[in-house]
A protein has these predicted regions:
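Membrane-interface aromatic/basic loop that binds lipid-linked glycans or pyrophosphate carriers
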Residues: 30, 184-219
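Amphipathic alpha-helical repeat scaffolds of TPR domains
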Residues: 166-178
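Nucleotide-sugar donor-binding/catalytic module of glycosyltransferases
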Residues: 1-148, 154-155
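Short, solvent-exposed helix-helix connector turns and helix-capping sites enriched
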Residues: 11, 161, 218-219
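Residue-level signal for alpha-helical context at structural boundaries
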Residues: 51, 107, 163, 170-171, ...
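C-terminal, non-catalytic tails of nucleotide-sugar-dependent glycosyltransferases
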Residues: 147-166, 198-214
Length: 219
């Protein structure tokens, strides 16, 4: 086929999800279609959350990258509440063995898109497991998440999407600050990520309008 979607092993989707996303993408000439998602317990009970996806619309790839800088940006980062045109994977691959592969790649997919169709309905059901990646506060999780955000900040700086560069760097700093303990290997990776953060901060400080106070507090 010419379209690709992903489903996490713990989750499930509405029967019509992929058909709706495909139709939205084709009708709008989009290279990707994204829907909202709902948080649920393992037995299917809804967990109240307010989604930032409130209307059907069509956005450019740059506009989607800017939404990665906004509140509740994880609705736009996750790899699974969407349908991708297959050709987007000619230039992008998920990193092997990472817990936060979507942190490393969401912006790269959006950068290739001329148009992204947004469908407001929550058709993906994100099951909240006590032992899931998103609930396990580990050094590895924090460090790998920070590394992905810093790669995104670096990319955004290179392509002058400054709002995304700022937000990604700040998010990474928050994860770095709270990454405590761990194995010697994890601590070594953390040191490398901190060095990467220092290099990006040096570049950010040269961008007019960046709030240096926030960087200083985080460090």
């Amino acid at each position: 086929g010419e379209w690709i979607g992903f489903l996490d092993s713990d989750d499930y989707v509405a029967p019509e999800m992929y058909e709706r996303l495909y139709r939205a993408a084709v009708e709008q000439g989009a290279q990707m279609a994204v829907c909202s998602f709902a948080y649920v317990t393992p037995d299917g009970r809804p967990i109240p959350r307010t989604s930032p996806i409130t209307k059907n619309e069509v956005l450019s790839g740059i506009q989607m990258m800017e939404r990665l800088a906004g509140p509740q940006n994880w609705y736009y980062i996750t790899a699974w509440n969407r349908l991708y045109q297959k050709k987007l994977f000619d230039a992008v691959r998920f990193p092997v063995g990472k817990l936060h592969e979507d942190e490393y790649t969401a912006h790269l997919f959006y950068w290739q898109c001329e148009r992204v169709a947004i469908v407001k309905e929550a058709m993906y059901y994100y099951v909240q497991q006590d032992g899931s990646i998103m609930h396990t506060e580990s050094v590895r999780r924090r460090v790998e998440g920070a590394a992905g955000m810093l790669e995104r900040a670096d990319f955004a700086l290179e392509h002058e999407v400054c709002s995304l560069a700022f937000a990604s760097c700040n998010g990474a700093l928050g994860r770095i600050v709270f990454a405590k303990g761990g194995s010697e290997e994890e601590r070594q990776v953390l040191r490398q990520v901190r060095e990467q953060a220092d290099r990006i901060i040096d570049r950010l400080l040269r961008v007019p309008g960046y709030r240096t106070e926030k960087v200083k507090v985080a460090l």
